[in-house]
Amino acid sequence: MNDVVKVGMADLNVVTPPHTIRTAGLGSCVGVVLYDDVKKVAGMAHIMLPDSALGKKQEFNRAKYADTALDLLLSKLEAIGAKRYSLKAKMAGGAQMFSFASNNDMMRIGQRNVEAVKKKLRELSIPILAEDVGGSNGRTIEFNPETKRLSIRTVHQGEKEI
């Protein structure tokens, strides 16, 4: 049995084998895994919002936003030996948890989170190898840096690996 490192909402962490890393409660939030399969290190961020410009400066949490969480996660991974050029990404989440009468862009948080994460990963030149995003159901994800498998449990849809 592996030791599981848990990542809370608007949080991030890094692991090495035999540890795995997990986050629960991904609705409109996006869980992003960055991993170096040569060094066998991985990190996960539970991103709540697309853009740090939405945040209040006095209580700023870099792990909460797509544009700042991935930079922070990258620096934590490099601190434990990851090489930026070896990093790959997997992601899940970004569901539309509620339906709204209007097509107001502000209500599409899940889709906006996914778009912001993809944009930031492009800027960092980190390829996305697999994703399970969108839909209308919550997810729990767990990543194993040894096998490079992201296990995804989706409400009412069971479990799969990417």
From Swiss-Prot:
Gene Ontology biological-process annotations: chemotaxis
GO MF annotation, one: protein-glutamine glutaminase activity
Similarity remark: Belongs to the CheD family.
First-tier enzyme category under EC: hydrolase
Protein's organism: Halalkalibacterium halodurans (strain ATCC BAA-125 / DSM 18197 / FERM 7344 / JCM 9153 / C-125) (Bacillus halodurans)
Quaternary context: Forms a complex with CheC.
Classification of source organism: Bacteria, Bacillati, Bacillota, Bacilli, Bacillales
EC annotation from Swiss-Prot or TrEMBL: 3.5.1.44
Keywords, in A-Z order: Chemotaxis, Hydrolase
PANTHER family: CHEMORECEPTOR GLUTAMINE DEAMIDASE CHED-RELATED (PTHR35147:SF1)
Catalyzed reactions per annotation: L-glutaminyl-[protein] + H2O = L-glutamyl-[protein] + NH4(+)
Role played: Deamidates glutamine residues to glutamate on methyl-accepting chemotaxis receptors (MCPs). CheD-mediated MCP deamidation is required for productive communication of the conformational signals of the chemoreceptors to the CheA kinase.
UniProt protein name: Chemoreceptor glutamine deamidase CheD
InterPro entries tied to this protein: CheD-like_sf (IPR038592), Chemorcpt_Glu_NH3ase_CheD (IPR005659), Cytotoxic_necrot_fac-like_cat (IPR011324)
Disulfide cross-links: none
Segments passing through the bilayer: none
